[in-house]
């Protein structure tokens, strides 16, 4: 696959909106092509804004593997969690309208709102919804909408009240998506509009984001849209179906292009001012969104080559990540979606912005491109970020392989299940997710999540009363251990799950589930 992406086909698949490439970006073409070859990325779009001007917006490669349609500046990609800044902006606009205050209690706007702890329910503010300090664990509750489920937004928010808290309220950073489903409801309640209508009329139309779509459901026939790609079983690159996320669009639903995201960056870097000089939002609102609320622990680099990227401070504001690089404050976010990942980075002190959109799942690709662009403008010692991130990816794969080898070495291969297979067949219920069904089929077992069509697969015996679920959809890369615990009478008491690979996306939060038999 690398040979195809790095070969002659890609030379005919680049487009560029502006005729002259700035001197600082003369090497960008070669960098992007190296990234595509190194990380097997079919298509990439990049836009760069400097001093109020769009200095580059361009596409490389193809929208879909094996098809000739090129990625262009107008090609739509899922921007996933880069949507969070739009949600935060929407709430600040409503604050400017006098419809709410950011420190209002959520329950004052949504009386039915509940967290699993009554104290947190009563104290949670609108600002808390945006800043990842609720006490929820990483990705808690994501299985209510990831992969696509049949739950509505209202059902997701209602079920939030059963998702357990694992930390203290406002105690530490833990990234979540589910509280943005609540933020979506607050916007609708305060504005009297749907979240989609609010985004369209108050942001997209005013900024000039004509091609941007509310979510995958709103892509139109003939839209210039990229197709997502994933490595099935972490190996073979193929296309994947888009996630339908209308039940939590506030966390990550938007599809946009390099062209439209450049307009968004222009507004951000102009303290909320639009092209005509009027204000989308005030400088005060921007200051609030860009102010650190929740500090983050800064991890050590996985390989020495990534050390120059390590921040001196890191935290989260309202819909934005905050850190530093080469003496400059960065305001940024990433987005991850089945088959697509992206990164938007602002350097306010240099009036610089860069967005990288890709139709593959390797974050190393957008990081290598982003840091290469930042280096070109900020100066200092040159660094080979493509090589550095390639080594980081390899290290991550090695660690995952070692963990799997340890599982295999510790496996009791001679053990047998305690029950006949039919003894495990039942409907099981988790308080926040709902039902999981295990059925006996032929000589084996199958497992399916009742509200998630993609989570259906066969159970393969591992040891004792532990199985591995092998999902039918091999693009998920989320196979999991399924452990049945028995009571003294030899009946299943509870079922717990755990992803088998460290590389599985954190949104597959199987470890937060506790299933018990439905009586």
Protein language model annotation of sequence segments:
Residues 59:
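Conserved beta-strand in the GNAT
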Residues 12-17:
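N-terminal signal peptide c-region/cleavage motif recognized by signal peptidases
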Residues 20-56, 188-201, 205, 239-519:
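Catalytic loop of the DD-peptidase/beta-lactamase superfamily, centered on the K-T-G motif
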Residues 1-6:
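Bacterial N-terminal signal peptides that target proteins for export
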Residues 141-146, 171-173, 215-219, 278-280, ...:
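Short coil/turn segments at secondary-structure boundaries
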Residues 39, 62-177, 184-185, 191-193, ...:
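Active-site-proximal loop and beta-strand segments within enzyme catalytic domains
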Residues 210:
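Short, structured active-site-proximal loop/turn typified by the sulfatase FGly-forming signature C/S-X-P-X-R
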């Amino acid at each position: 696959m690398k040979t195809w992406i790095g070969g002659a086909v890609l030379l005919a698949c680049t487009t560029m909106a502006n005729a002259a490439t700035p001197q600082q970006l003369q090497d960008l073409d070669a960098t992007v092509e190296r990234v595509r070859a190194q990380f097997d990325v079919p298509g990439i779009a990049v836009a760069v804004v400097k001093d109020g001007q769009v200095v580059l917006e361009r596409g490389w490669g193809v929208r879909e593997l094996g098809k000739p349609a090129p990625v262009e500046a107008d090609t739509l990609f899922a921007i996933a969690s880069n949507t969070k800044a739009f949600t935060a902006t929407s709430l600040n606009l409503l604050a400017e309208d006098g419809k709410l205050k950011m420190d209002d209690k959520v329950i004052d706007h949504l009386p039915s709102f509940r967290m699993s702890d009554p104290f947190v329910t009563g104290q949670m503010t609108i600002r808390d919804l945006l800043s990842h300090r609720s006490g929820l664990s990483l990705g808690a509750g994501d299985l209510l909408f990831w992969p696509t489920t049949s739950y509505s937004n209202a059902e997701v928010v209602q079920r939030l009240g059963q998702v357990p808290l694992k930390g203290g309220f406002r105690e530490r950073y833990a990234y979540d998506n589910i509280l943005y489903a609540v933020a979506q409801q607050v916007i609708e309640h305060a504005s009297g509009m749907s979240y989609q209508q609010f985004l369209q009329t108050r942001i997209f139309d005013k900024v000039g984001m004509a091609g941007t779509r509310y979510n995958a459901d709103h892509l139109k026939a003939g839209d210039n849209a990229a197709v997502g790609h994933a490595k099935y079983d972490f190996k073979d690159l193929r296309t994947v179906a888009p996630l339908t996320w209308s039940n939590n669009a506030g966390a990550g639903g938007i599809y946009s292009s390099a062209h439209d995201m450049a307009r968004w960056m222009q507004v951000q870097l102009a303290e909320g001012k639009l092209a005509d000089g009027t204000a989308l939002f005030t400088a005060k609102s921007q200051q609030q969104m860009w102010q650190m609320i929740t500090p983050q622990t800064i991890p050590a680099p996985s390989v020495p080559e990534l050390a120059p990227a390590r921040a001196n401070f890191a935290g989260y504001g309202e819909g934005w990540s905050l850190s530093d690089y080469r003496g400059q404050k960065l305001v940024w976010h990433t987005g991850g979606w089945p088959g697509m990942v992206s990164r938007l980075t602002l350097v306010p002190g240099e009036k610089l912005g860069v967005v990288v959109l890709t139709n593959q799942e390797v974050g190393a690709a957008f990081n290598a491109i982003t840091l290469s662009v930042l280096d070109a403008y900020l100066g200092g010692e040159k660094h080979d970020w493509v090589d550095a991130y390639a080594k980081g990816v390899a290290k991550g794969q090695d660690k995952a392989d070692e963990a799997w080898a340890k599982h295999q070495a510790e496996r009791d291969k001679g053990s047998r299940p305690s029950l006949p297979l039919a003894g495990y067949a039942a409907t099981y219920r988790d308080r926040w997710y709902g039902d999981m069904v295990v059925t006996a089929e032929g000589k084996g077992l199958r497992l399916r999540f009742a509200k998630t069509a993609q989570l259906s697969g066969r159970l393969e015996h591992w040891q004792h009363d532990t199985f591995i679920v092998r999902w039918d959809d091999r693009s998920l890369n989320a196979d999991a251990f399924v452990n049945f615990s028995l009571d003294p009478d030899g009946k299943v008491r509870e079922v717990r799950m755990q992803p088998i690979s460290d590389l599985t996306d954190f949104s597959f939060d199987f470890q937060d589930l506790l299933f018990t038999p439905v009586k």
